[in-house]
């Protein structure tokens, strides 16, 4: 009987170890090993961010696809919508621009629809409501082609809703309002794993909203981007560019001046900010200090 009890204890310990290891694996945050991601916080963007996108897309030889699906139909169906979208990129020297839009996953699964993605060097998601992108593209052939674009060393960028959709967890994914952090759409396109991404954070005083997600999904890394600010992601690391700040929710605190004497809140209620030039390791969830 004692031997059976010992065996049972050992089996339970091994089971708990496997579960813990699986949990640890699931909570690893990283992006695609190839290519570049640009996650942009929305608002009016300086030319610096667009030119950075152009650089990673191949400069003057770039071939980009623009996905405006996050925008509402009452805009997209106007006669001038596609003209203005195209002009917005042409003024930065993008000569080969394809606008790709659907709200139908059947269409997004057709070879004809995904053809422009097969030769694209860059992809850009416009802002609006991120759940619209999920409805049209999630788990389709078009979605798979986006990963292949990264495999080729291309760049995927997106601003506002186009930022949030790049994460694995879809923040503000409710169809009724953007004020609900955990809505009826919770899955993003997953270019970065185990992450929730918010935007317009400081401009709209959203810096505390991320905790609504993290108290229910504590394994996630939370990132909030302010307007005219972006992170440029390569593999496990990103660098901040732009005019404002990126808010980090990783359960720790970091400051250039140190934090040992600061009276900080509990780990589940703390955040800190990074500015242009700062770098962060997603896998380790730590600021990179040179």
Label every PLM stretch briefly.
Residues 116-119, 141-153:
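Catalytic-core regions built around general acid/base machinery
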Residues 1-27:
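Bacterial Sec-dependent N-terminal signal peptides
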Residues 21-60, 71-83, 87-96, 170-172, ...:
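C-terminal and late-domain segments of enzyme folds
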Residues 39, 122-126, 157, 197:
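Structural motif
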Residues 65-69:
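Short internal beta-strands
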Residues 130-139:
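Glycine/threonine-rich flexible loop motifs
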Residues 125-127, 146-170:
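Catalytic nucleophile loop
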């Amino acid at each position: 009987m004692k031997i059976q009890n010992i065996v049972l204890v050992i089996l339970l310990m091994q089971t708990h170890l496997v579960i813990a290891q699986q949990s640890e694996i699931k909570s690893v945050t990283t992006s695609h090993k190839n290519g570049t991601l640009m996650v942009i916080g929305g608002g009016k963007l300086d030319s610096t961010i667009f030119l950075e996108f152009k650089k990673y897309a191949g400069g003057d030889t770039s071939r980009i696809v623009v996905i405006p699906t996050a925008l509402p139909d009452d805009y997209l169906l106007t006669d001038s919508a596609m003209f203005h979208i195209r002009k917005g990129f042409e003024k930065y020297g993008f000569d080969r621009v394809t606008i790709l839009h659907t709200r139908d996953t059947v269409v997004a699964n057709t070879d004809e629809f995904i053809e422009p993605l097969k030769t694209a060097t860059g992809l850009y998601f416009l802002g609006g409501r991120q759940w619209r992108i999920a409805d049209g593209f999630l788990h389709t052939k078009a979605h798979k082609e986006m990963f292949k674009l990264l495999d080729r060393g291309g760049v995927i960028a997106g601003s506002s809703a186009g930022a949030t959709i790049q994460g694995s967890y879809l923040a503000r994914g409710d169809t009724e309002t953007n004020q609900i952090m955990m809505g009826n759409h919770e899955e993003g396109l997953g270019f970065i794993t185990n992450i929730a991404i918010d935007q317009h954070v400081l401009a709209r005083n959203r810096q505390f909203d991320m905790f609504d997600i993290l108290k229910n999904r504590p394994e996630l890394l939370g990132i909030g981007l302010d307007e005219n600010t972006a992170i440029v992601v390569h593999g496990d690391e990103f660098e901040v560019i732009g005019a404002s700040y990126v808010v980090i929710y990783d359960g720790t605190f970091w400051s250039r001046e140190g934090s040992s004497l600061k009276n900080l809140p509990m780990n589940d209620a703390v955040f800190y900010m990074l500015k242009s030039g700062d770098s962060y390791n997603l896998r380790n969830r730590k600021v990179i200090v040179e």
